[in-house]
UniProtKB/Swiss-Prot annotation:
<feature type="binding site">
    <location>
        <position position="100"/>
    </location>
    <ligand>
        <name>NAD(+)</name>
    </ligand>
</feature>
<dbReference type="InterPro" id="IPR011304">
    <property type="entry name" value="L-lactate_DH"/>
</dbReference>
<dbReference type="InterPro" id="IPR001557">
    <property type="entry name" value="L-lactate/malate_DH"/>
</dbReference>
<feature type="binding site">
    <location>
        <begin position="30"/>
        <end position="58"/>
    </location>
    <ligand>
        <name>NAD(+)</name>
    </ligand>
</feature>
<dbReference type="GO" id="GO:0005739">
    <property type="term" value="C:mitochondrion"/>
</dbReference>
<comment type="similarity">
    <text>Belongs to the LDH/MDH superfamily. LDH family.</text>
</comment>
<dbReference type="GO" id="GO:0006089">
    <property type="term" value="P:lactate metabolic process"/>
</dbReference>
<keyword id="KW-0560">Oxidoreductase</keyword>
<dbReference type="GO" id="GO:0006090">
    <property type="term" value="P:pyruvate metabolic process"/>
</dbReference>
<dbReference type="InterPro" id="IPR001236">
    <property type="entry name" value="Lactate/malate_DH_N"/>
</dbReference>
<dbReference type="Pfam" id="PF02866">
    <property type="entry name" value="Ldh_1_C"/>
</dbReference>
<feature type="binding site">
    <location>
        <position position="139"/>
    </location>
    <ligand>
        <name>substrate</name>
    </ligand>
</feature>
<comment type="pathway">
    <text>Fermentation; pyruvate fermentation to lactate; (S)-lactate from pyruvate: step 1/1.</text>
</comment>
<protein>
    <recommendedName>
        <fullName>L-lactate dehydrogenase C chain</fullName>
        <ecNumber>1.1.1.27</ecNumber>
    </recommendedName>
</protein>
<dbReference type="InterPro" id="IPR018177">
    <property type="entry name" value="L-lactate_DH_AS"/>
</dbReference>
<keyword id="KW-0520">NAD</keyword>
<keyword id="KW-0963">Cytoplasm</keyword>
Length: 334
């Protein structure tokens, strides 16, 4: 007896469905991982989304919840498993797995706990998707991006840390609040470490091409009567504040990661402040990953913009690198 499917559908082509060309995997289905997943789905960036985690019940519940919303999405396949074979042939793998930052805990204090987690995750990712681009989100992101590079054996341009892409978004939001101008029209970068030693590049802050430093040379310094320096302090403190209030951060980092993914999947060539190897730049001679303005396209992180920094900004960037190297040099990575 013929099935309902056989009676309903007449096949014209016997071939199976085409393989996905923009498969995206999210490692970790915690608050950050799911915010990344939802952001990727809503921006319609993937033709297949895979989720992987060691917590089977949580994983099954999350993927069922997303699948039940398939009618409202444009991603035809959403899958999940604790086995990394589900991630096979991913174009982009977003790593959010790891232990969560606690209230008042510096991101750098997380490092050794998360390094041990990555020793399991990264070899599995590369085994099933040797041609993928890896975006590291777990904290401390700069050190874990370095760890991912070492563990994966992949070229530098295919290892990207989410870095200060979110810090810079926070910076632009706070500037926009002070000026009453939309964040997209307030331009400025936070560079260096995603964390306490980040560098606000006040020399480059502008609105419609008008440098704020040209209007107020002391902006961002202790001599500034308008206390713009407080804006950078709020950027540094904001994650701690959100964690104190709601227990974790997730939505803004999810949006930030989806923007990075979009620049790659759509081959946009947009500039993002993301974490990359900075040895040989700005007088830094150690193998550390810090955020600089980078061009992202379909091949990954293809180039770094040589931003003209003032001497004090270079000094802060070097201090940022020294802080990371002080911890990184003693890690047991391999």
């Amino acid at each position: 007896m013929s099935s309902v499917q056989e009676n309903l559908i007449t096949n014209v082509c016997q071939d199976k469905a085409a393989k996905p060309t923009n498969k995206i995997t999210i490692v970790g289905v915690g608050q950050v991982g799911m915010a990344c997943a939802v952001s990727v789905l809503l921006k319609e960036l993937a033709d297949e989304l895979a989720l992987v985690d060691i917590l089977e019940d949580k994983l099954k519940g999350e993927v069922m919840d997303l699948q039940h919303g398939s009618l409202f999405l444009k991603t035809p396949t959403i899958v999940a498993d604790k086995d990394y074979s589900v991630t096979a042939n991913s174009r982009i793998v977003v790593v959010t797995g790891g232990v969560r930052q606690q209230e008042g805990e510096s991101a750098l204090n997380l490092v050794q706990r998360n390094v041990n987690v990555f020793k399991f995750i990264i070899p599995q990712v590369v085994k099933y998707s040797p041609d993928c681009i890896i975006i590291v989100v777990s904290n401390p992101v700069d050190i874990l991006t370095y760890v991912t590079w070492k563990l994966s054996g992949l070229p530098q341009h295919r290892i990207i840390g989410s870095g200060t892409n979110l810090d810079s978004a926070r910076f632009r939001h706070l500037i926009s609040e002070k000026l009453g101008v939309h964040p997209s029209s307030c331009h400025g970068f936070i560079l260096g470490e995603h964390g306490d030693t980040s560098v606000a590049v006040w020399s480059g802050v502008n609105v419609a091409g008008v440098s704020l430093q040209s209007l107020k040379p002391e902006i961002g310094t202790d001599q500034d009567s308008c206390n713009w320096k407080e804006v950078h302090k709020k950027v540094v403190d904001s994650a701690y504040e959100v964690i104190k209030l709601k227990g974790y951060t997730n939505w803004a980092i999810g949006f930030s990661v989806a923007e990075i993914v979009e620049s790659i999947t759509k081959n946009l060539g947009r500039v993002h402040p993301v974490s990359t190897m900075v040895k040989g730049m700005y007088g830094i001679e150690t193998e550390v990953f810090l955020s600089l303005p980078c061009v992202l396209n379909g091949n990954g992180l293809t180039s770094v913009i040589s931003q003209k920094l003032k001497d004090d900004e270079v000094g802060q960037l070097q201090k940022s690198s020294e802080t990371l190297w002080g911890i990184q040099k003693d890690l047991q990575v391999l």
